[in-house]
Amino acid sequence: MRVLLIHSDYIEYEVKDKALKNPEPISEDMKRGRMEEVLVAFISVEKVDEKNPEEVSLKAIEEISKVAEQVKAENVFVYPFAHLSSELAKPSVAMDILNRVYQGLKERGFNVGKAPFGYYKAFKISCKGHPLAELSRTIVPEEARVEEVPEALRKEEEELVSYWYILTPEGELIEVDKFDFTGYENLRKFVNYEIAKNRIAEKEPPHVKLMLEHELVDYEPGSDPGNLRYYPKGRLIKSLLEQYVTEKVIEYGAMEVETPIMYDFEHPALEKYLNRFPARQYIVLSGDKRYFLRFAACFGQFMIKKDAIISYRNLPLRMYELTRYSFRREKRGELSGLRRLRAFTMPDMHTLAKDIEQAKEEFKKQFKLSMEVLEGVGLTPEDYEVAIRFTEDFWKEHKDFIVELVKLIGKPVLIEMWKQRFFYFILKFEFNFVDNLDKAAALSTVQIDVENAERFGITYYDENGEEKYPLILHCSPSGAIERVMYAILEKQAKLMNEGKKPMFPLWLSPIQVRVIPVSEEYLDYALYVAGKLEGAKIRVDVDDEDERLNKKIRRAEKEWIPYIVVVGAREKENGTITVRRREDGKQYETRIEELIKEIKEKTEGFPYKPRPLPLLLSKRPKFRG
């Protein structure tokens, strides 16, 4: 079943003609109708719903009721609408399910109207236009599900209701449909994405074209979808990001470890943990035993901590692994370039804290660490939106702490609040990048976990020598490395749309300087300049192609080279270079040593790796036709 929910000022319809040979019998007064201040449910009943009409009806009633509660609508209008699906159920089944939904909503106390089934109808509707006003839901009967989720868990999840707010740095908590989004358009887009929960990629995001054009990353037809290949320039960027985040986390105080990529389905602690997640694992068979490929570093780090002897003096205890790879079998329609993959590289730190106060202190520090890490890759708070999620009880007890976090970011954030705890954590934040298609992807995240220490048997000895269960903070200060690359490319696509020059952060640029001789006569001097730069650990190449100077410059511009160095007779005679700086468009003549000094100052504190391709352009293969 597909459901489109529109919170409306009114809806009115008029029957025009029969659409089916045997439509629903109706009286004269059913040929037209109107309802005001209403949640309209446009519904397509699908072929798969024939497997279990009762279950689909109950789930639809539940979903529609939840949304009606969120938008505070007392009136609900059920509108048969075949155009949400191409796989429709038999008319008799569809009519039965729609009537079940209609009656079920009435039994829940709503004032319910409906349009007749099987007719062509004209209708008018006035959508209210707030963030909750347009939502969609897909409901699938259990027999049709590919994934298996435990019945008790599914029931709990279905009953979980999210309450959405905007929290300002001044501490004002505002219901999301009452917040004035003027000046916060990106936040509005993020809110709409979060509440609608539509993860399907309808079209290709701009970063995909850029990753292919720049020969960074490509699809691998010989592998499972969502597993990518990286060309030399893309591997360099990814490798530098991995090194950068790892250095930041170790500098923060984490101990780096390495753990297996596969785990036993039947391990008691892992079995319980898996029940908290949808069954989207890759399965590996070894003899007659089944293993799953990890979707995070939690398992391995928890097993190490379970076996360790830990004192209260060791807390907070931070452990880190860069997982290459973590695996998650995302739905095919949700896979999208670098944004959502089935194999991804995740920097994953877990911190043990003795109590909630120490956990809050660490949470705040890791919030700041995440901001710092993203700033280093060229993403400021203006580039991402923040979501903070917690229970109502946590808000009541720790409101001032939450407001402190919002003050750090300096702008309004989205709040998701629950009446009771369903997940293993009591507090979570994410920094979310909203791309050019208005899709959001979580980057940095931290959670306070209150379940898994006991589940895995992780303990520490307190001041009195008694064993206690610590709290666990899950932290990825950047999010998946592939997602960071996605965010960088999507940001550059936005700049291009605004008529600005795109470029990678200087320390991440595969080639930082391109030296172009004005003719073959000056190739030796170009190589001399390149040698000086390379000796200073600057990634440099030389365009030795037999082409006109303007074409070479255009090629370097198209590749987003930060510094284009042109050398000819004057430069060779004076021992200088002429530089075009992409960042500000400035062109100037200088000495090699001065350019080295400028680049080293701008890349100080960031990791370095050598040039990923041959020095001379004429020696390079093309990876894409």
Swiss-Prot record:
GO CC annotations, alphabetized: cytoplasm
Residues annotated for Zn(2+) binding in this entry: C298, H350, H474
PROSITE patterns on file: AA_TRNA_LIGASE_II
Region span, Editing domain: 1-143
Keywords for this protein: Aminoacyl-tRNA synthetase, ATP-binding, Cytoplasm, Ligase, Metal-binding, Nucleotide-binding, Protein biosynthesis, RNA-binding, tRNA-binding, Zinc
Record keyword Iron-sulfur present: no
Subcellular location(s) of the protein: Cytoplasm
GO terms assigned for molecular function: ATP binding; threonine-tRNA ligase activity; tRNA binding; zinc ion binding
Cofactor binding description: Binds 1 zinc ion per subunit.
Necessary cofactors: Zn(2+)
Main localization of the protein described in the UniProt heading: cytoplasm
Coiled-coil stretches: none
InterPro entries the record matches: aa-tRNA-synt_IIb (IPR002314), aa-tRNA-synth_II (IPR006195), aa-tRNA-synth_II/BPL/LPL (IPR045864), Anticodon-bd (IPR004154), Anticodon-bd_dom_sf (IPR036621), DTD-like_sf (IPR023509), Thr-tRNA-ligase_IIa (IPR002320), Threonyl-tRNA_syn_edit_dom_arc (IPR015011)
GO biological process, one term: threonyl-tRNA aminoacylation
Domain comment (free text): The N-terminal domain (about residues 1-143) is an archaea-specific tRNA-editing domain that has a highly similar structure to Dtd (D-aminoacyl-tRNA deacylase); the domain binds L-serine and L-cysteine and most D-amino acids but not L-threonine. Editing of incorrectly charged L-seryl-tRNA(Thr) by this domain is tRNA catalyzed.
Reported function: Catalyzes the attachment of threonine to tRNA(Thr) in a two-step reaction: L-threonine is first activated by ATP to form Thr-AMP and then transferred to the acceptor end of tRNA(Thr). Edits incorrectly charged L-seryl-tRNA(Thr) via its editing domain. Deacylates correctly charged glycyl-tRNA(Gly), but neither glycyl-tRNA(Gly)(2'-dA76) (the terminal 2'-OH of tRNA(Thr) adenine 76 has been replaced by hydrogen) nor the 2'-fluoro tRNA derivative do so, strongly suggesting the editing function is tRNA catalyzed.
PANTHER family named among the record's database cross-references: THREONINE--TRNA LIGASE, CHLOROPLASTIC_MITOCHONDRIAL 2, THREONINE-TRNA LIGASE
Assembly with partners or alone: Homodimer.
Family recorded in the similarity comment: Belongs to the class-II aminoacyl-tRNA synthetase family.
Alphabetized HAMAP family for the sequence: Thr_tRNA_synth (MF_00184)
Name the UniProt record assigns to this protein: Threonine--tRNA ligase
Organism: Pyrococcus abyssi (strain GE5 / Orsay)
Source taxonomy: Archaea, Methanobacteriati, Methanobacteriota, Thermococci, Thermococcales
